[in-house]
Amino acid sequence: MRIALTTVQAPFVSGGAEFLANNLKKALIDRGHEAEIVSIPFMDSPTYLIENHIVASRLFDLEHSWAGKIDLCIGLKFPAYYIPHSNKVVWALHQHRAAYDLFDTEYSNLKSNEDGQYYRNVIYNADNLYLKEAKRIYTISENVTARMRKYNRIGSTALYHPCPDAEKFYVEGYEDYILMTSRINITKRQMLAIEAMQYTKSNTKLYIVGKADNVYEKDRMLAYIKELKLGNKIKYFDYVTQEEKFKLYANAKAVLFIPKDEDYGYITLEAMESSKAVITAKDSGGPLEFVEDGKNGFIVDPTPKEIARAFDEIAMSKNLAREMGTASKKHLLEMNVSWDNVVKELTR
């Protein structure tokens, strides 16, 4: 089949969504399909752009291209999953969360005022109307499925996929550091992890890896480490190569991933591919679908002292990191998270 993958992109910004689209394209091509990513630019600030983008998405025609008929359209992101097609399935990374669970919070630019309520309703109504055009709706996790059911009463099926370069992760050992890899962003809660290091009793260190969304976020984080006098306990890597990242995973004691209500979270899968326990929080969303508390990681309250307790428990035990890490890899294999399964479902 000739398949179009519809998504959006903020120019010069790249992350998990771009990884997913590229890897889905490769998976489809590897299995005999023709596939192309159709990406449209997106900005939600100022807020009037939201409505413009929705209207623009409805004006595209993807039934044909100069190459011929397009057999299937797979919609990935708001509002590109509104693009019309007679044979469309949606595999939603997430909805526009600023209008849903993040509305009127520090994580959203839509507030509980006349302007915010207007654009929230625009998004609600568009999702309710246009998502139902799809022949089938999938999401990337049970967390996203639950949100869609809660806010829109739209049913969907969770369809898990592997993290990028899954086959390149490996395990070497369990050295005395906890690894935290995420872009530096308020929703990833690096500040909470830093604060937790005040309360650790073990000698374990925290390695933070990731580029900041902006200079302010990075400067704020580094200033906080300095303010708490934790420079000897925390190491920050602004940039690492892929090979360096694999090695950091391979030798970590465990992996910390405590985002606020994550949709999916490649970091969980990267840790499990590397045979590492995952320390996550009770409100972290996606990771909770993979982590079993006390078996292949810890699920803790999102407080500094509880996170520190988990650090110390795994750091002070001789064998716990290895035992949990082994269980982590085994659990991932049992879940059959594979591109074969994804392609089979999306193209059936």
Residue ranges and their predicted role:
Residues 108, 113-137, 145:
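Membrane-proximal helix-turn-helix segments that form the acceptor-binding/catalytic region
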Residues 170-188, 194-201, 206-208:
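Conserved donor-binding/catalytic core segment of Leloir-type glycosyltransferases
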Residues 218-240:
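Nucleotide-activated donor-binding/catalytic signature segment of Leloir-type glycosyltransferases, i.e.
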Residues 239-240, 247-252:
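Short alpha-helical donor nucleotide-sugar binding micro-motif in glycosyltransferases
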Residues 260:
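Aromatic "clamp/platform" in nucleotide-sugar-dependent glycosyltransferases that forms part
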Residues 277-281:
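Short hydrophobic beta-strand element within catalytic cores of glycosyltransferases
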Residues 292-294, 298-305, 313-318:
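Conserved acidic donor-binding segment of nucleotide-sugar-dependent glycosyltransferases
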Residues 306, 313, 320-335, 341:
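A short, well-ordered alpha-helix in the C-terminal region of glycosyltransferases
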